[in-house]
Regions:
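N-terminal export and membrane-targeting signals
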Residues: 1-19, 246
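A detector of low-complexity, intrinsically disordered, Ser/Thr/Gly/Pro/Ala-rich segments
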Residues: 5, 37-38, 56
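Gly/Pro-rich cap/lid or specificity-loop segments adjacent to the active site
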Residues: 30-33, 54-340, 399, 405-530
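Short, charged low-complexity linear segments at domain edges
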Residues: 3-4, 8-9, 186-190, 320, ...
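Bacterial lipoprotein signal-peptidase II cleavage site
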Residues: 28-38, 42-44
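Extracellular mucin-like PTS domains
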Residues: 48-53
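Alpha/beta-hydrolase-fold enzymes
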Residues: 305-401
Length: 530
């Protein structure tokens, strides 16, 4: 799988990375105390006291039947997920029934899984705060209990609510191949093909993946896109009893949040988008952005090690070229291929706190001729456990991405991108250029649009947080999201730092977000931290 769409680094390491937040730098440009959506104690204004227009959904979307809108969640003790442990006694789980096809709301339905930890201060409870940690394909039901320690202050007055979006894990999760098939693909498919035979195998694997999705998950597959997930989110809001949506989205979760704001601007409450996907970029644009972003992060890492960025990048590129010819052995008996090594290098670039692990893994590969460290990092990114079982985030991720995007670049188009992408990044460029063709090759479902619609005129202020050294969602994408949301809606917050996501990493950003969620204080547009 590729770096272009995955945000597992934020999800898996959320708790550990956030615990290190106190090491980061402080804040500039103080915010104001604007409270357009709050009473004196920080609660959102009651709809009866300050009515806001319930703007209609996109034209032609039928109303939901009362059997769906009148649902009341039945919260029960959570059970253990497959291969995992049940969360603690503070957590409760339920599901909400949603239309399979929001264009036919009285037709077939599916269930969306939720998990909740209730607010500690019941007397001052504000409402529900929903989370999406990215992906697409990340399981909020699985991630939130592990990351909840980072949101203790918010949990004082909010119920913390995670959910598995449609097509993910417990919400009719998409599955496309067996663990054995996945292992075989990682072992044999070259994701930077150099010959006609490698190109053919590369495209054939993409088509086989799509066929497996259709065979195993055909009913839900056409309906797993982001616009449907955003409509699910609005039904969840209603079922939970919240007049407006309070939401914290990371990475892909920012695209979901922006889509929600576009569809339901009058129902936007307090929404924060962190590590922001560029809403103006298509598939090739995202690959181009990530080639730039990951190369920038790699060069910052090399500078931190006291190395020349150009020389260090060239050295790593030579290592990858050697692996293309001859993979490295590991103690497990598996081999470290070029493609797995690229993934292993990508993984620790999501957070500077994992840079020492990258150093150890590269030293092991270059000096000792062993691939254990990079393979271990790649396995973490790819969702592989020690027993060779893979989670299904990669399956859901591709299904959602290809349901969203109309783009289906060809092998010839990908090959034509190689010179440009090598110039952007000698390490990651070829990998990302080829990924544009392999990702949705032969996909059995047409995509919905070129780029997401995120304009939200009339919505309440939405905090848009960009980190200058973010490798996966480069800073410029946050600026474009703020612009697309519209004047007075997108409130830009800049974090001068490294890594994928700023909340919990930067005390300045964290303080601004907490004040916004808890007190309704909107920071100045252009707040800069670090």
């Amino acid at each position: 799988m590729t770096a272009r769409r995955r945000t597992r680094g934020r999800a898996v390491r959320a708790g550990a990375a956030l615990l290190a937040a106190g090491l980061l730098a402080g804040c500039g440009l103080p915010g104001t105390d604007r409270e357009p959506d709050a009473t004196t104690d920080g609660r959102p204004r009651d709809a009866s006291a300050s009515p806001s227009p319930e703007l209609k959904d996109t034209p032609g979307s039928p109303a939901l039947p009362s059997s769906l809108t009148s649902q009341r969640p039945d919260w029960k003790r959570c059970t253990a997920p497959p291969g995992g442990r049940a969360p603690g006694s503070d957590w409760r789980c339920t599901s909400v029934t949603v239309p399979l096809d929001h264009g036919k709301p009285s037709g077939e339905t599916i269930s969306v899984a939720l998990i909740r930890k209730e607010a500690r201060d019941k007397d001052r409870r504000i409402g529900s705060l929903l989370f999406n940690f990215g992906g697409p394909g990340g399981s909020g039901v699985g991630i939130l209990p592990r990351a909840a320690g980072s949101y203790g202050k918010l949990n004082s007055r909010y119920d913390l609510v995670g959910f598995d979006p449609r097509g993910v894990a417990a919400s009719s999760g998409v599955r496309c191949r067996t663990d054995e098939e996945q292992e075989q693909a990682f072992r044999t498919v070259d994701l930077t093909p150099d010959t006609a035979a490698e190109e053919a195998a590369f495209i054939e694997d993409g088509a086989a993946f799509g066929a497996g999705c259709e065979r195993r998950s055909g009913t839900v597959l056409p309906h797993v896109g982001t616009s449907n997930a955003a409509r699910d989110l609005d039904l969840i809001r209603q079922v939970l009893g919240d007049d407006k949506l309070s939401y914290l989205g990371f990475s892909y979760g920012t695209e979901l949040g922006g889509t929600y704001a576009h569809l339901f601007p009058g129902r936007v409450g307090r929404v924060v988008l962190d590590a922001v996907v560029d809403p103006t970029a298509d598939g090739i644009g995202h690959a181009r952005n990530q080639a730039t972003g990951f190369q920038r992060a790699l060069e910052n890492y090399l500078k931190d090690r006291g190395q020349d960025p150009k020389t260090g990048s060239e050295r790593i590129a030579r290592l990858l070229a050697r692996l293309d010819e001859k993979p490295l052995p590991t103690s497990s008996g598996r081999e470290l291929t070029e493609s797995l090594a690229i993934t292993g290098i990508v993984t620790p670039l999501y957070s500077r706190y994992n840079w020492p692990e990258l150093t150890a893994a590269l030293d092991e590969a270059e000096k000792e001729g062993r691939g254990d460290g990079l393979l271990r990092l790649a396995d973490s990114y790819n969702g592989r456990d020690e027993d060779g079982r893979y989670d299904t985030q990669a399956h859901s991720q591709r299904a959602i991405s290809c349901a969203d995007s109309k783009a289906r670049p060809t092998v010839d188009e990908a090959r034509a991108l190689l010179p440009e992408f090598r110039g952007l990044s000698p390490v990651f460029g070829p990998f990302l250029a080829w990924d544009t063709a392999g990702w949705c090759a032969g996909w059995p479902v047409d995509g919905e649009r070129e780029t997401p619609e995120t304009s939200a005129p009339g919505a309440a202020p939405i905090l848009v947080i960009g980190t200058t050294g973010d490798p996966a969602t480069p800073y410029e994408g946050a600026q474009r999201m703020a612009d697309e949301l519209g004047k007075g809606v997108g409130i830009m917050v800049t974090n001068k730092g490294e890594g994928h996501g700023a909340y919990g990493e930067s005390p300045c950003v964290t303080s601004a977000v907490d004040a916004y969620f808890l007190d309704g204080k909107v920071p100045d547009d252009g707040l800069t931290c670090g």
